[in-house]
Amino acid sequence: CRVVVLDACFNGSFHLDDCIADEYIFGQGHTIACIANTVNVLQDKWADRYVGLLGLGMYVGNVARFSGYLESHCIGDPTFAFTPAVKMEEVNDLLASNDPVKWQKYIGENTPSDLRSMAMEKLWQQGRLSSAQLLRIFRTSKSALVRLQALVLLAEARDDNFIEAMKLGVDDS
C-alpha cells in the first residue's frame, strides 16, 4: 500500500520513540506517505474531506493541508501523487489557484464530487458563492458529499438558508 490514512490519536506522534506511522514508512513495505495525527484529535471531524482528490492526482500532503486540523500531518513524501483517473487540468496547479473563473468551471453537477466540493469551498471563501446558491446546491445535488459540503458552508453563514437546509437535512439519506 502506497498511502495510509490513520485517523486516531497519537498514531503520527513523530516526536515519540514509538510511532505507528513510522512503522509504515520505515518498514519493509512500499508505503510512501501516511496521514496521521500527532496528538489527541477531535472525534467528530471530517478528516477525509478532500481525500477523493487523490484520485485526480492531488499530492498526498494536500490531504493534511486542506483538512484544517493542526494535529494532522503527512509523514513521508507529501509530493507523492497517484496517476489521475480522469484527464483534466493539473489538479495541484488548480489547488494553488484562487482564480474564481477557474473554480467556477468546476461548480457544475457533472464535476467529480470532491472537486466540486473544493470549488464550492474556494468560491465561498472568496465571497463568490452565496448562501442562496449553496441552499440550491443542497436541494438539487445527487451527491451526498456535495450536499454535506453545502451544509458545512451554510453553517458558516448562519442565516435563514442554513436553517432551511437543516430542516431539509433531517430527511436526507
Residue ranges of model-derived segments:
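Caspase-like cysteine protease fold
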Residues: A47-L129, R136, L145-Q149
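Active-site proximal loops enriched in glycine and acidic residues that flank catalytic Cys/His/Asp
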Residues: D7-F10, A36-V39, S67, P78, ...
